[in-house]
């Protein structure tokens, strides 16, 4: 009887364990389906600035040294002013790295070193006017702009397909164009999908991303992350981290609604006083070098977002190919090269690679 009881108990125990295991697996499956993908490896990117010359191994070694696993390659098109519909691109007057041939050579060189690519064609308006204000004054000009932009972006979608790049950015900070012509954007995304089968994003300005109407058609919510996070001349890590709290809450909520991860298509801080106050500013009026402000704001960004499940990674703004000749402790611009913040980035990227 004890033997029978023993076997009966064992059988019931196995049934119980099987049932619990099944419920646990089922619950896990439901949880995984309802949540965003979690990866210990993030997109640790640099914005690889176009140059006059071809890229060689000496230009890529510093990118490897900082443990970047992605680079944004950025060919350019140029527009004369905010109401002009013609985009000039891929011309002999441009720097090599701004053209299709140059972008292709950069991609090949980076790929050979195991660095993945976001191809990010961008528009530059003469005199540095903000592209978010690009807006036509007539239907005729809107149609011309649409055709010109289609030619521009399809040219590089074809390059993305040819080079099998991992990620393609369909535009950068073009809010008025998107607000006024949403049907064009949805149509051109379909055209791009027919050519290029990799992942797609759009680089929305930090205060624009909630108004972009086509995130459902893309793979990542791209944000140029120049959020104001601190008012101090030399903010501490704690102050800047507190400044990130509200933005993180907004980003997480938006990611949850769209069921897509946030990708910082650009992020970074200048090495100047008040680096966290208006991080989008690139004008030369801000020229008081403050390396500590850059260090603190950068570390706060890493601490605030990089481990989050809703966060895919980001692309540091910006990284020049001639590493030994740029940046340095007297430089007040965005580049981290040859500044103390470079070591902060190196350590952080290594941990998420």
Which residue stretches match the model-derived regions?
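N-terminal substrate-binding region of glycoside hydrolase catalytic domains
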Residues: 30-104, 128-141, 175, 221-227, ...
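Short, acidic/polar
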Residues: 50-64, 146-159, 205-214, 295-304
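Aromatic-lined carbohydrate-recognition surfaces of secreted/lumenal glycan-active proteins
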Residues: 119-123, 169-178, 186-210, 259-267, ...
């Amino acid at each position: 009887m004890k033997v029978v009881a023993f076997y009966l108990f064992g059988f019931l125990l196995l049934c119980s364990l099987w049932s619990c295991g099944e419920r646990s697996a089922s619950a896990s499956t439901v949880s995984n389906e309802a949540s965003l993908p979690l990866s210990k490896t993030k997109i640790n990117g640099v914005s690889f600035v176009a140059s006059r010359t071809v890229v060689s191994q000496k230009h890529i070694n510093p990118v490897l040294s900082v443990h970047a696993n992605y680079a944004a390659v950025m060919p350019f098109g140029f527009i004369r002013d905010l109401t002009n519909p013609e985009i000039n691109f891929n011309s002999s007057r441009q720097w090599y790295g701004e053209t299709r041939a140059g972008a292709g050579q950069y991609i090949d060189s980076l790929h050979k070193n195991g660095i993945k690519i976001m191809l990010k064609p961008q528009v530059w308006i003469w005199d540095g006017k903000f592209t978010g204000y690009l807006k036509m004054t007539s239907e005729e000009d809107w149609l011309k702009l649409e055709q010109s932009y289609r030619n521009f972006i399809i040219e590089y979608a074809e390059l993305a397909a040819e080079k099998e790049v991992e990620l393609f950015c369909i535009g950068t900070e073009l809010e008025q164009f998107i607000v006024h012509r949403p049907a064009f954007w949805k149509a051109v995304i379909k055209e791009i999908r027919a050519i290029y089968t990799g992942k797609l994003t759009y680089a929305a300005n930090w205060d624009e991303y909630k108004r972009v109407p086509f995130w459902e058609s893309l793979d990542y919510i791209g944000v140029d992350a120049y959020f104001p996070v601190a008012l101090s001349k030399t903010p501490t890590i704690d102050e800047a981290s507190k400044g990130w709290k509200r933005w993180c809450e907004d980003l997480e909520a938006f990611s949850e609604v769209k069921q897509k991860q946030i990708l910082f298509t650009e992020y970074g801080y200048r090495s100047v006083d008040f680096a966290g106050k208006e991080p989008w500013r690139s004008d030369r009026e801000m020229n008081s070098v403050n390396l500590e402000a850059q260090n603190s704001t950068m570390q706060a960004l890493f601490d605030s977002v990089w481990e989050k499940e809703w966060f895919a990674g980001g692309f540091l703004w910006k990284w020049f190919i001639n590493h030994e000749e740029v940046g340095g402790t007297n430089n007040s611009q965005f580049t981290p090269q040859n500044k103390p913040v470079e070591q902060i980035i190196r350590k952080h990227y290594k941990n998420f690679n």
